[in-house]
Structures are given as C-alpha cells and as structure tokens.
Amino acid sequence: AIHFLLALGLTLSVTNCFAQISKEQAKERKALVKSSKSELNEKATKTARKEAKKLIKEGWKSAPGALPLEKQLDKSYIMQMEYDEDMFPKFIMAEAMSIGQNYDAAKMQALELAKQNLAGQIQTEVTALIENTVANKQLEPEDAASVVQSISAGKSLISQSIGRVIPVVELYRTTSNKNKEVLMRIAYNATMAKTAAKKVVKENLEKRGDDLHEKLDKLLGW
C-alpha cells in the first residue's frame, strides 16, 4: 500500500472531538512556511527521490503521456509543503488505488475513491481550523462543537460539493493476472475546500435555526 509520509503532517489525531495538529506537526508546518522556495524545492526533491525508488521497486510506472514518475512526485511534495499563515495547507491532498480489467476503468475508480478520501481530508483540516479558533479564544467550545458536528456529519455532502481536482500523480502497474492497478494522487485548492465545507456547515446550521455561520464568516473569512 502507498501512504503519504506522516512527517508532512497530513494525518491529524482526534482529541476531544477536535482534530488537533500535534506540536511536532505544527512546528514542522511553521518551519515550512518560513522556508524559502529553494529550500522547499530541495526538501521536496529529496523526499520524492526516496519514494520514487520505493515505487519503482514495487513495479509502478508513469502513465502514458504523463511526466516521469520522479517529476510527478516532486510536484506532489512541493504542493504538500505549502501552507498559509494559519498553517492551513494551500492544497488538500488525497490518493487512492484501484484495480480493473482495463486502464481507463481502474483510473476512473481510483479517481472517485481519491475524491472520497479528499472529502475526509477536508473534514480533518477544517476541523483543525475550527479548533484553532477555540484555542485563540475566538469561538466558544460549545459553538465549535456544533460546527464540528456539522462537518463530521457532512462528508458525503462535502464530497458532492468538490469541483475540479488537480491530478498530481498518475501511476500504474500490471498485476499477476494481467489486470491494471492505477494509483491517483490529487490536489484541491484550499479556498475551494473551505467553500465546500462552508456550504455543508451553513446548510446544517440553518436547518437547526442556528445563525452561528455568520460568526464563522467573520472569524474565518468564509
């Protein structure tokens, strides 16, 4: 199985119903924000080379017409290392794999699965953003809990709200029974991700007669 490197802080632990970024992850994100473009490129290239060796050993190849495997990974890690001043990723990343009798069918299924995983990543990152407003005493814990509940219940709605994604990595390999296995890694613009989450939260809160979404507009710039 292929996994993102945990060191890049894409996996957040959940505590007290909030997705919290660990001190180590927050520290790394701050360091990445302060890094120069050349430093980020160097770090991304180093990480990409390491993963490329692993993937090639496992039989993965670049899709026809796509960039070389290492170049795709390089681009992926550069995008993963970009954060704004609130430590929110500039791109939400997700990936998935699928096996099919032909390449196109496997690719389509992998893309759909990646979008579902993307919805989960959006949930995680936006929940962490909400938790941060509580830490900064901008939002009361009970209000935050209400918002988090809306986000947690809305994964399928977030998934439906996702617009155009950016395919960043597209690899394939042939299985022992001649089927095609495709790996897709996609990226989604952070602004669009927040918009997708906002829509779900707003609709949920309005159904309950809660005007909390107006406060979120001011606090989070939604």
Provide a role label for each language-model segment.
Residues 1-3, 19:
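Positively charged n-region of N-terminal signal peptides that target proteins for export
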Residues 3-13:
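Bacterial N-terminal signal peptides
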Residues 19-222:
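Domain-level marker for long, solvent-exposed, non-transmembrane regions
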